[in-house]
């Protein structure tokens, strides 16, 4: 079960959270390079050097507030990594500034630039795509997962295998 939504933001101080978001909103000139460096050394081995990985979510273009909240939840034990079993340790090694910088870096990456292979001709693809679109619309997923809701992750463009796993953790 995913415990991220159960983590009250008061578990880590509002001051820390706001300070991290200030780094995201108004970074110094070197922030992009430092954020990229943190991603390459701490994140890319699981999340992919080019932003695409097999078992983990695509982080490129993700909402910065969601990344900050997720990393803080992993760091403080309010969210448990049930996929790779390593996020809690990785996040605990990041400073608040590191978290803000990597969140800003990832938010600035265009997910449309990712080289994601989709087999449109695969048997059953059209039916599965249509069923997914209908389920998305009827379940009101977009209410939280569209770009205007900054605490929910962007799910458009995520891999089906990851979405299935993530959804199973919410049941």
Task: Locate the predicted segments by residue.
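N-terminal secretory signal peptides that target proteins for export/translocation
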Residues: 1-12
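Bacterial N-terminal signal peptides
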Residues: 13-25
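Sequence/structural segment immediately N-terminal to covalent heme-attachment motifs in c-type
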Residues: 31-49, 115, 120-147, 159
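Extracytoplasmic/secreted proteins, especially bacterial periplasmic and envelope-associated proteins
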Residues: 34, 38, 66-69, 86-89, ...
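N-terminal targeting signals for Sec/Tat export/insertion, comprising classic cleavable signal peptides
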Residues: 36-61, 65-73
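Disulfide-stabilized extracellular ectodomain repeats and their linkers
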Residues: 40-43, 56, 64, 84, ...
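Axial heme c-ligation environment in periplasmic c-type cytochrome domains
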Residues: 53-60, 74-110, 114-122, 150-156, ...
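Short microdomains enriched in Cys/His and/or Lys/Arg
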Residues: 64-74, 160-171
């Amino acid at each position: 079960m995913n415990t991220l939504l159960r983590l009250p933001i008061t578990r880590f101080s509002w001051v820390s959270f706001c300070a991290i978001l200030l780094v995201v909103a108004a970074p110094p000139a070197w922030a992009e390079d430092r954020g990229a460096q943190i991603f390459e050394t701490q994140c890319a081995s699981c999340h992919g050097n080019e932003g695409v990985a097999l078992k983990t979510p695509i982080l490129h273009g993700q909402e910065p507030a969601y990344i900050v909240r997720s990393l803080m939840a992993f760091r403080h034990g309010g969210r448990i990594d049930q996929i790779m079993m390593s996020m809690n340790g990785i996040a605990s090694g990041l400073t608040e500034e590191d978290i803000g910088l990597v969140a800003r870096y990832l938010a600035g990456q265009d997910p449309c630039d990712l080289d994601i292979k989709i087999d449109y001709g695969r048997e059953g693809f059209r039916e599965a795509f249509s069923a997914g679109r209908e389920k998305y619309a009827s379940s009101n997923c977009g209410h939280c997962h569209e770009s205007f809701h900054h605490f929910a992750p962007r799910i458009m463009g995520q891999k089906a295998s990851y979405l299935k796993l993530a959804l199973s953790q919410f049941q």
